[in-house]
Amino acid sequence: MQLFHLCLIISCSCPTVQASKLCLGWLWGMDIDPYKEFGASVELLSFLPSDFFPSIRDLLDTASALYREALESPEHCSPHHTALRQAILCWGELMNLATWVGSNLEDPASRELVVSYVNVNMGLKIRQLLWFHVSCLTFGRETVLEYLVSFGVWIRTPPAYRPPNAPILSTLPETTVVRRRGRSPRRRTPSPRRRRSQSPRRRRSQSRESQC
């Protein structure tokens, strides 16, 4: 279904503006957000600038290097693997469609417009999808969501009141570990007391044995 929706957007952008508005209005009326089931949203991803996301080729190479076996497996691994499979297939079909349109449109301006639309607009959406799911598999969903919220707060804060550098995703797990370590002594406070209470018993038993 997702592939059908993406191809419909491209096909409706060619004939007339009216047909394009009808198709896009029908799709937008469904209020489909591919990130909702993962705790994120299109709006949350939009805080990241377009040049933040690697190229599709780099993202595909990363996904293939890290998760090729799982992606090619007939088994259901996780929702992120399934979403990655769909995004990769959608991009392949979009490339085939752009190639076909580019070869069959006689008007060079229209041909360039369609190819540019696929590469820029749809390309950005696919880059966002690939980055999100690869990052969730690599760093964990909670870490990625924490990063998106942190970056959203940072980018919306006036420059005079925010750190000079934006948050970095790869450093968030280290920060999370530090926070967990900082909280752990509070949970483990009873353990030293138990050890202390047990030590006199051992000493008493040893003294009794020595007396016997």
Curated annotation (Swiss-Prot):
Record's keyword terms, sorted: Disulfide bond, Host nucleus, Host-virus interaction, Repeat, Secreted, Signal, Viral immunoevasion
Compartments, as annotated in UniProt: Secreted; Host nucleus
Annotated GO MF terms: DNA binding; RNA binding; structural molecule activity
Pfam families attached to this UniProt entry: Hep_core_N (PF08290), Hepatitis_core (PF00906)
Location of region: HBEAG: 25-27
Modification after translation, per record: Phosphorylated.
InterPro entries noted in UniProt: Hepatitis_B_virus_capsid_N (IPR013195), Hepatitis_core (IPR002006), Viral_capsid_core_dom_sf_HBV (IPR036459)
Propeptide stretches in the record: 184-212
Region (3 X 8 AA repeats of S-P-R-R-R-R-S-Q): 184-206
Main location: secreted
Gene Ontology CC annotations of this record: extracellular region; host cell; host cell cytoplasm; host cell nucleus; T=4 icosahedral viral capsid
Gene3D superfamilies reported for this sequence: Viral capsid, core domain supefamily, Hepatitis B virus
Biological processes, Gene Ontology terms: microtubule-dependent intracellular transport of viral material towards nucleus; symbiont entry into host cell; viral penetration into host nucleus
Region span, Disordered: 165-212
Sequence repeats: 184-190, 191-198, 199-206
Composition bias type Basic residues, residue spans: 178-205
Site residues by UniProt (Cleavage): R183, S184
Family note: Belongs to the orthohepadnavirus precore antigen family.
Protein name per its UniProtKB record: External core antigen
Source organism: Hepatitis B virus genotype C (isolate Vietnam/3270/2000)
Source taxonomy: Viruses, Riboviria, Pararnavirae, Artverviricota, Revtraviricetes
Gene of this entry: C
